[in-house]
Amino acid sequence: MTYFVIFLGVCFMLGTLAVASNPSPYYGVVGLVLASVVGCGWLVNLGVSFVSLVLFMIYLGGMLVVFVYSVSLAADPYPEAWGSWRVMGYGLGFVLVVCMGMGLGGFVDFWKIGVTTVDSGGMSFVRLDFGGVAAFYSYGVGLFLVAGWGLLLVLFVVLELVRGLSRGAIRAV
């Protein structure tokens, strides 16, 4: 089970690397979906399946709307692919930064990594998911409203970033 969680962590890092080093919004969606699916799978493995499902729906529902708007408004007839040297350089730089952070943080010894899942201590523990359901229904209303307004703000920020310094990349709608 530990190897599976480590595999999910590596896939999550690759997904975030694909989002961070994407040359075009067309390719960023693939990395976003990979990172969110693997991150929610990691949460399911740790025992919080309801929280994982809610986060998956909110994240993909909100952020994919932002990517769809930015893709539809960006006029990029020849997008740069992941195989270009510039994107490979960005990817290599991100991998080196992550490796340096792991080395400086003392996280290099992979054989002593242990991840406890929800049933690792026996069936006497209360599942974390039950507390998550109660928190979402009682305290989560304000957080969801703030998250919705934040996603709307992110939408306008991304649209302004896609537009650039002039009206060059945005088309009239």
From Swiss-Prot:
Catalytic activity from the UniProt record: a ubiquinone + NADH + 5 H(+)(in) = a ubiquinol + NAD(+) + 4 H(+)(out)
Pfam families linked: Oxidored_q3
Major place of residence: mitochondrion
Source organism, top-level taxon: Eukaryota
EC number: 7.1.1.2
Record's protein name: NADH-ubiquinone oxidoreductase chain 6
Record function comment: Core subunit of the mitochondrial membrane respiratory chain NADH dehydrogenase (Complex I) that is believed to belong to the minimal assembly required for catalysis. Complex I functions in the transfer of electrons from NADH to the respiratory chain. The immediate electron acceptor for the enzyme is believed to be ubiquinone.
Any coiled-coil regions, as ranges: none
Organism: Coturnix japonica
Transmembrane stretches, start-end: 1-21, 27-47, 48-68, 87-107, 139-159
One GO CC annotation: respiratory chain complex I
One example of a Gene Ontology biological process annotation: mitochondrial electron transport, NADH to ubiquinone
GO molecular function, one term: NADH dehydrogenase (ubiquinone) activity
